[in-house]
């Protein structure tokens, strides 16, 4: 995606080539007093992942193995393969899917989340709210 420390060229110092930009998300909002946590998630083959939920702050993920089926409210479902990144703004947005897109391999990802003070890192969304917000979900793929 690009360099992080400027363009030192092929002959420049190694520190100008050592870091590769994988994701640049904007705008993000982090509440005063927020904390950050980084977790490693391991899904067995075909695991659908966490039920629809939201995070209290932004989350930034990197898939280390396999492929994640990712769906955020208002965005179409997509598959993020190993080496790919994802992010979500947190707050009110519903995260519908984060499961393993592969039926025969494990999937793993690392995610760093900013947690609003006094709030849980993850909150499941009740069925009633999902129905009320159905119009905000992107159209589902058809088989």
Each predicted region: which residue ranges?
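A short, N-terminal "cap"/entry segment at the start of jelly-roll beta-barrel domains
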Residues: 1-37, 79, 123-143
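A short, acidic/glycine-rich surface segment
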Residues: 23, 47-50, 94-99
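Short beta-strand/loop turn elements enriched in aromatics
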Residues: 30-33, 47-57
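Short acidic-glycine-tyrosine-enriched beta hairpin
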Residues: 31-35, 42-44, 67, 72-92
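Short, conserved beta-strand element in jelly-roll/cupin
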Residues: 42-44, 55-70, 109
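Short histidine-centered beta-strand/loop micro-motifs
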Residues: 50-54, 72, 79, 98-100
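Ligand-binding loop in jelly-roll beta-barrel domains
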Residues: 76-77, 90-120
């Amino acid at each position: 995606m690009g360099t992080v420390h400027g363009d030192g060229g092929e002959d420049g110092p190694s520190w100008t080539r050592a870091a590769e930009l994988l994701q640049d998300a904007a705008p993000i909002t982090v509440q005063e007093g927020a904390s950050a946590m980084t977790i490693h998630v391991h899904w067995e083959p075909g695991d659908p992942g966490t039920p629809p939920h939201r995070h209290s702050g932004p989350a930034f993920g990197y898939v280390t193995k396999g492929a994640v089926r990712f769906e955020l409210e208002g965005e179409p479902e997509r598959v993020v393969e190993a080496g790919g990144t994802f992010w979500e703004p947190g707050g009110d947005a519903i995260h519908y899917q984060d499961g393993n897109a592969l039926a025969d391999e494990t999937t793993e990802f690392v995610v760093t989340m900013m947690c609003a003070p006094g709030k849980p890192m993850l909150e499941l969304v009740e069925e009633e709210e999902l129905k009320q917000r159905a119009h905000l979900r992107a159209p589902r793929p058809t088989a």
